[in-house]
Amino acid sequence: PNCPHAVIDILPEQKSIEGLGGNMRLGGRDVALSPDTQAWRLLGQTDSVRMRFRHRYEVDPQYIDSLTAKGLVFSGKAPNQPIMQILELPDHPYFLATQAHPCMTSRPLEPQGLFLGLVAAARQHACPDQDLPGPVQAAQKVNQVKSTHKHPGEKTDVRKRKRVKNS
């Protein structure tokens, strides 16, 4: 806050908020994904996803161009605001960061794509001599299973990733 170049700073709309809950961006938010990025591939090759957030900081928009000029990719953004939600380095095996909490949308039988990518990248790094699926391949396999997996007495609305009771 008292530095000359605050690349990461508190969200402008949050600066004047005080009291219960404080100055946080909370809850479910849509994230627009950039095509052909690792985040886009891990999260199902879709234009946008709904993710859960609990943060108060952002990349100061005046630094975005200089960061992207050096190779950083902001692959997930707030749809109608200059808030960067996911970033990655494309030339790294798995350098991906998010403001979201993937743990809030991950389930034991339906792991969130960013977690799958992390585990697959760690396995590949730990066992380079084994033929293991990479982060994207692992997420794609699980997404295929998710779209066909049904629990007894339930059906899955794949678009919303929500289970509903059969009538």
Regions found by a protein language model. Name each.
Residues 1-167:
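Amide-donor transfer/coupling interface in amidating biosynthetic enzymes
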